[in-house]
Amino acid sequence: MPQRIALELQALVAETRRKYPDVRQSAEHLLAQWQADADRTVSELQSCKDPSSHALLQMIVLACETRSPKVIQLALSLLQSSIPLRILPDTSLATVIDTLHTLLSAPGRTDVDVQLKILQIVSSLLVTYANVTSELLSRALMLCFTLYEHSRVVVVSSTAAAMLRQNVMVVFEKVQSEDQSFDAIQNEDAAVNAPLPVGTAELPSGPVTLFPCAADVYHLLNDLCALADGQPAQFLPLDTLSKPFVLELLESVLTTQSSLFQRHPELVYILRSAACPFLLKALSKPPASFSVYIRAMRLVVLLLCEYHEEIVLEVEMLLR
């Protein structure tokens, strides 16, 4: 991977030699350090916590401001290669996501390869950085939703849909890791490193404390149910989303995450208060779309088979 970054820096130097001297100088300086001692350069970049003085990050931002598709592609390749090495500090993630959003300010005019690269980077960020939560997570996912909804290129919109399926699963799987970290706490020293609560979910039985990843899943599931019911989301800045697609996302969640619902009553409450009502509504009137009706029926079958013990009354209502 370090060798790959050196090659990408060389390509960026060559591409910016004539038109973009600021980017070229930054790339040349970083390349010289990299060739002299790659391990030391990686260590120094990893230890730099100030985004404004992070050499690689600032070079990438400069390159993305050129509006040259080739230069931007090379910069995003560098960004993608740096993520598994965690060269970028956690404090830089907001800058990274803001930069990607800037590139999509006019999706129809953004280079296709740049759009595809952005989708890959978002997935890599979610897998690598545990603290992509809350607003950062919302903004990261919106990059994918924007390309899914607005890209005019079929390969981009289909890739965005695939990445969204994958990324939603990653968000839910992070809750399992968070739960396991609490299960592993056996002494005060371990408790010090445990995540701090970020909010509560108000349930009829009383409030439930939410930790970062659990809060993300709670808000995301709420949003998916709202969008399936034709209502605007709150965690995600989305007013609408293709109903067949949002039902597909819900089906993926319910198919693979039943054990998570058993441990988290706030998620079961969403099934009761949001999922079952919109399914009852969808099945009680003539279907506007055959694909929506079929997907709604599949969700009902899933609830009957996998969640009947958690939502007994709601299941009875669905069977009437």
Regions found by a protein language model. Name each.
Residues 1-2, 41-49, 86-94, 107, ...:
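HEAT/armadillo-like alpha-solenoid scaffolds in large eukaryotic assembly and transport factors
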Residues 1-24, 29, 132, 142, ...:
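Eukaryotic intrinsically disordered, low-complexity segments enriched for acidic and Ser/Thr/Pro residues
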Residues 12-44, 56-57, 69-83, 96-100, ...:
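HEAT-repeat alpha-solenoid elements in large eukaryotic scaffold proteins
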Residues 18, 65-67, 106-110, 147-151, ...:
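Short coil turns that connect the paired helices of HEAT/ARM alpha-solenoid repeats
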Residues 59-63, 99-106, 146-148, 227, ...:
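Alpha-solenoid HEAT/Armadillo-like helical repeat scaffolds in large eukaryotic proteins
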Residues 60, 79, 100-101, 141-145, ...:
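Extended amphipathic alpha-helical scaffolding regions
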Residues 87, 143-152, 166-174, 186-193, ...:
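Eukaryote-specific, cytoplasm-facing alpha-helical/coiled-coil scaffolding segments in long proteins
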Residues 98-157, 162-163, 167:
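Extended alpha-helical scaffolding segments
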